[in-house]
From Swiss-Prot:
Disulfide bonds, paired cysteine numbers: C47-C142
Catalytic reaction annotation: O-phospho-L-tyrosyl-[protein] + H2O = L-tyrosyl-[protein] + phosphate
GO terms for biological process, alphabetical: cell integrity MAPK cascade; negative regulation of MAPK cascade; signal transduction
InterPro entries: Dual-sp_phosphatase_cat-dom (IPR000340), Prot-tyrosine_phosphatase-like (IPR029021), Tyr_Pase_AS (IPR016130), Tyr_Pase_dom (IPR000387), TYR_PHOSPHATASE_DUAL_dom (IPR020422)
EC number: 3.1.3.48
PROSITE patterns registered for this protein in UniProt: TYR_PHOSPHATASE_1, TYR_PHOSPHATASE_2, TYR_PHOSPHATASE_DUAL
Pfam families: DSPc
Region (Disordered): 1-43
Positions that bind 4-O-phospho-L-tyrosine: H111
Protein name: Dual-specificity protein phosphatase SDP1
Basic and acidic residues: compositionally biased ranges: 28-43
Length: 209
């Protein structure tokens, strides 16, 4: 399944037939080939039942070329190479005091949290860091659901891709991601909000004499 077969989030900038959106690509060994769509979610598995260190055996995983990494709960040593760290797990330790040189954000999400109000500010934090070419780590406890949801939301907004595209893109680079169904529903609402904002902006532009 080609991850670019669905339309982009806004039809006015969709690629021509057969042409992929111009996203930078990662090296082959940094990507997975498994492409499962949000509508084909596996049963959600609680992090407590998994061997977390086997999910990312090589440490933080580069998932987007703008220096965005996905990971499970890190050690202090693993945080040191990063400029910005976003921890979106209620149960994960807040390590900001141990890494004073790192811009550290802790949003205490649970798997059933209402995250919609946090997505605009969090995706803006990520985007601001990318414009400064800073190295960004986004993590939760396992690195499968909450942190993946945030990265998908970022892709949707700043790469202007649909939820399906954004999910498949991240899935192709971190094949074990598995956002809970509740978070997927909230990403669907995020997509509606982004489309509504785009339509308002497009209409305003057309009214300019």
């Amino acid at each position: 399944m080609n991850i670019y077969t669905s339309p982009t989030r806004t039809p006015n900038i969709a690629p021509k037939s057969g042409q992929r959106p111009s996203l930078p690509m990662l090296a082959t060994d940094e990507r997975s080939t498994d492409k499962e769509s949000p509508n084909e979610d596996r049963e959600f598995v609680p992090c407590s039942s998994l061997d977390v260190r086997r999910i990312y055996p090589k440490g933080p995983l580069l998932v987007l070329p703008e220096k965005i990494y996905l990971y499970s709960e890190p050690t202090v040593k693993e945080l040191l190479p990063f400029d910005v760290v976003i921890n979106v797990a209620e149960e994960a330790n807040d390590l900001r005091m141990q890494v004073p040189a790192v811009e550290y954000h802790h949003y205490r999400w649970e798997h059933d949290s209402q995250i919609a109000l946090d997505l605009p500010s969090l995706t803006s934090i990520i985007h601001a860091a990318t414009t400064k070419r800073e190295k960004i780590l986004i993590h939760c406890q396992c690195g499968l659901s909450r942190s993946a949801t945030l990265i998908i939301a970022y892709i949707m907004k700043y790469h202007n891709l649909s939820l399906r595209h954004s999910y498949d893109l991240l899935k192709s680079r971190a094949d074990k991601i598995n956002p809970s169904i509740g978070l997927i529903f909230q990403l669907m609402e995020w997509e509606v909000a982004l489309n509504a904002k785009t339509n308002v902006q497009a209409n305003s532009y057309r009214k300019v004499p």
